[in-house]
């Protein structure tokens, strides 16, 4: 795919240029709880940029149709009240010049993420910058497009927000929610493994995020510590939707994800459904408690593959009985018999440790809504 074809393919996710360096992007307002979280970021020292967010008070978003006479200067639908990110309704033209660029927050294969502040509103976010040339040469333009299409429509406490996106001649940019503590992977490497109290909080939150995604027929397919971010009060947010897929048919057969976390149906190239994420959550729980994935082998991918398909699972004796039970229920060879995420809040391991959590379960949690 050529550079021109990449730009054309991005048109469905609002990346068409109206002017040489400025394009229109859709911006999505934060929920009140999310705004409160980002307001607290002012306590974190970040060098050049203060992370104090502008004071904004607003009600839940309502969509209102724009009069035809105003279509030339406004979008077809606008938000009421104004978006806390833009300070204006509807769409806003953006270019890189609209941001103060702060420290680098992370680096990936195709670009970097920076702490940025909107010069007009003072709103702090994370800007993911990727070179178009590298996306094309890496043959990941479809993966990037998928990430934008999926993440633009997600609103959940435990899912990283994508506020908007734009591009210029050489790069594409994603305006993302700023999460103060960064990758959970780094914390796990520093601590070697988590306490059961901490791990149970994270696994519960992941189950809520996955329930939300599965309810929208989205399979993440790449659950791992590197794709989880840590915010205030032990709140985690799942990120990196490059391997995710919107799967209305509920059955797929594409090989993807990270080898240590892949379920047997994927490594054996069999059709799979949302239960692949349940398997990966079981792997994640094991790594949280033991410091490494359960089927990881020094012998390489083939050795790991053999252990996965044989379910060669060895749980250390220091893992509690109810934790081991949950791991085994998620790591079941038959996808249909794997643990149901909707029952996570009732599992004895979660019930026993929930009073010890720093994280406070919101009233919007799946089981709270159905109570």
From Swiss-Prot:
It is found in: Nucleus; Cytoplasm, Cytoskeleton, Spindle; Chromosome, Centromere, Kinetochore. It comes from the Eukaryota. The gene is IPL1. It catalyses: L-seryl-[protein] + ATP = O-phospho-L-seryl-[protein] + ADP + H(+); L-threonyl-[protein] + ATP = O-phospho-L-threonyl-[protein] + ADP + H(+). Residues 1-15, 48-80 have a biased composition (Polar residues). Belongs to the protein kinase superfamily. Ser/Thr protein kinase family. Aurora subfamily. Residues 99-350 form the Protein kinase domain. This is Aurora kinase. GO terms for cellular component: chromosome passenger complex; cytoplasm; kinetochore; nucleus; spindle microtubule; spindle midzone; spindle pole. Component of the chromosomal passenger complex (CPC), a complex that acts as a key regulator of chromosome segregation and cytokinesis. Has a role in error-correction of aberrent kinetochore-microtubule attachments to ensure that sister kinetochores become bioriented and connect to opposite poles by promoting spindle assembly checkpoint signaling. GO terms for molecular function: ATP binding; protein serine kinase activity; protein serine/threonine kinase activity. One of its GO terms (biological process) is mitotic spindle organization. Keywords: ATP-binding, Cell cycle, Centromere, Chromosome, Chromosome partition, Cytoplasm, Cytoskeleton, Kinase, Kinetochore, Nucleotide-binding, Nucleus, Serine/threonine-protein kinase, Transferase. Residues 1-84 are annotated as: Disordered.
């Amino acid at each position: 795919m050529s550079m021109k074809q990449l730009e054309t393919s991005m048109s469905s996710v609002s990346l068409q240029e109206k002017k040489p360096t400025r394009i229109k992007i859709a911006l999505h307002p934060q929920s009140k709880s999310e705004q409160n979280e980002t307001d607290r970021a002012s306590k974190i020292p970040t060098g050049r940029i203060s992370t104090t967010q502008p004071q904004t008070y607003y009600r839940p978003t309502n969509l209102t149709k724009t009069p035809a006479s105003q279509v030339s200067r406004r979008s077809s639908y606008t938000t009421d009240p104004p978006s806390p990110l833009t300070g204006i309704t509807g769409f806003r033209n953006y270019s890189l010049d609209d941001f103060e660029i702060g420290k680098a927050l992370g680096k990936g294969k195709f670009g970097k993420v920076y702490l940025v502040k909107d010069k007009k509103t003072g709103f702090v976010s994370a800007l993911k910058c990727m070179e178009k040339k590298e996306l094309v040469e890496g043959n990941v333009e479809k993966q990037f497009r998928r990430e934008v299409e999926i993440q633009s429509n997600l609103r959940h406490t435990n899912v990283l927000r994508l506020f908007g996106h734009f591009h210029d001649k050489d790069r594409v940019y994603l305006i993302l929610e700023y999460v103060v503590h960064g990758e959970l992977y780094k914390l796990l490497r520093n601590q070697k493994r988590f306490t059961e109290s901490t791990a149970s909080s994270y696994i519960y939150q992941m189950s809520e995020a996955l329930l939300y995604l599965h309810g929208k027929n989205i399979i993440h397919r790449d659950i791992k510590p590197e794709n989880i971010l840590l915010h205030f009060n032990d709140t985690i947010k799942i990120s990196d939707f490059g391997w995710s897929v919107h799967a209305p048919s509920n059955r797929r057969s594409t090989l993807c994800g990270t080898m240590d976390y892949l379920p047997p149906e994927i490594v054996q190239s069999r059709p799979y459904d949302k239960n692949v994420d349940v398997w990966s959550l079981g792997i994640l729980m094991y790594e949280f408690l033991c410091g490494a994935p359960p089927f990881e082998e020094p012998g390489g991918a083939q050795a790991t593959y053999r252990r996965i398909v044989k379910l060669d699972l060895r749980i250390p004796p220091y893992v509690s009985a109810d934790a081991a039970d949950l791991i085994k229920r998620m790591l079941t060879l038959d996808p249909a018999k794997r643990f149901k995420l909707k029952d996570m809040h009732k599992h004895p391991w979660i019930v026993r440790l929930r009073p010890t959590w720093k994280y406070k379960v919101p009233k919007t949690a799946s089981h709270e809504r159905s109570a």
